[in-house]
Amino acid sequence: MTCNVAFIGLGVMGYPMAGYISKAGHNVTVFNRTKSKAEKWIGEYKGKMANTPAEAADGADFIFTCVGNDNDLKEVSLGENGLFNTAKKGCVYIDNSTVSAEISRELYKAAKDKGFDFLDAPISGGQAGAEGGILTVMVGGDEGTFKKAQPVIDCYSQKVKLIGPSGSGQLTKMMNQMCIAGTVQGLSEAINFGINAGLDMDKVMETISKGAAQSWQMENRYRTMTDDKFDYGFAVDWMRKDLAIVIEEAKLSLIHI
């Protein structure tokens, strides 16, 4: 079934994600703060461009956001030109951003009060996963809403799972980022050790990647790390932002980490 879809936020993740929804045959209207990105998108994919989040959301069956942080999400959602001003009753709002569980629960309640539904649905897989349409999506919200939205989420993902009630998607993403950060740090230390010990890193990685040390980061990042090339994948500043969310959530929940 063809649906009217709004997609707000055309960064390195959102741009191809919106593209996959368009290629699946849905009617997509995009908004991005930097207008040139939206103009580029409509030149590449079938769809329309809006001047505000509210304009993009007007008449949409499904509204997607993929923005940088809590403040950005509040602005495009609840701001003067935010999507809450025009979102129709019965629509589903799916947020793919990595933000706090607190703001997700706030938007869930605000959406209910307005007569529509909200899912927190952060993503994992990086730019390559977005461009390949093979992202992993961890979802928090109501089961009925999830079942309604899943066919559209499937357009850009290979694995979608409802974890639990509102906020559960973001809490799961926090765990995901903790695991990745620890793995990257360990891999970095190991590579530094191996290089300074005079080892052939190709032989080392070919060997240990077949054992218990194997990880996605080892398979996909060891060579660029060995070559001191770091303009790949997920930016350090974004990881720091995500880990700050983890620390704040742990404090609020009295969890020792």
Describe the predicted segments one by one:
Residues 1-65, 91, 96-97, 127:
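NAD(P)+-binding Rossmann beta1-loop-alpha1 motif at the extreme N-terminus of oxidoreductases
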Residues 28, 49, 117-119, 160, ...:
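Hydrophobic beta-strand scaffold residues
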Residues 67, 99-177:
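Rossmann-fold dinucleotide-binding core
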